[in-house]
Amino acid sequence: MSANYIEVQIFGQVLRLHCPPDQQENLLASAQRLEERVALLKDQSGIIQLEKVLAIVALNLNYELEQEKQKNANNKAVLESCIHQLDNSLSKLLSGSSVAINQESV
């Protein structure tokens, strides 16, 4: 098997996927978590059709991803606001220092 491909077994099916060597461990862990989520949903819901369970898990994962994107956007906005406030404070502080220095030299 090429170093750029990895075989992953999901629900009894072997998938051969292109994957950089430094990301193979994460891909295997992701496949394991996917199997766990599907098994949990099947147990909790009683749904036995794999296609339905996969669709629900995919929808849940996408929803969680969108929530994380929104959190990241909110965090970015807060950080940008803090940086702007710090920049303004620093500018005021530095402009006040230059005025004080100019007055001392007069």
Swiss-Prot record:
Pfam families xrefs = ZapA
Where found in the cell?
Cytoplasm
Q: Which UniProt keywords apply?
A: Cell cycle, Cell division, Coiled coil, Cytoplasm, Septation
One GO CC term, this protein:
cell septum
What task does this protein carry out?
A: Activator of cell division through the inhibition of FtsZ GTPase activity, therefore promoting FtsZ assembly into bundles of protofilaments necessary for the formation of the division Z ring. It is recruited early at mid-cell but it is not essential for cell division.
Q: How does it assemble?
A: Homodimer. Interacts with FtsZ.
**What is the designated name of this protein?**
Cell division protein ZapA
Please give the organism.
Actinobacillus pleuropneumoniae serotype 5b (strain L20)
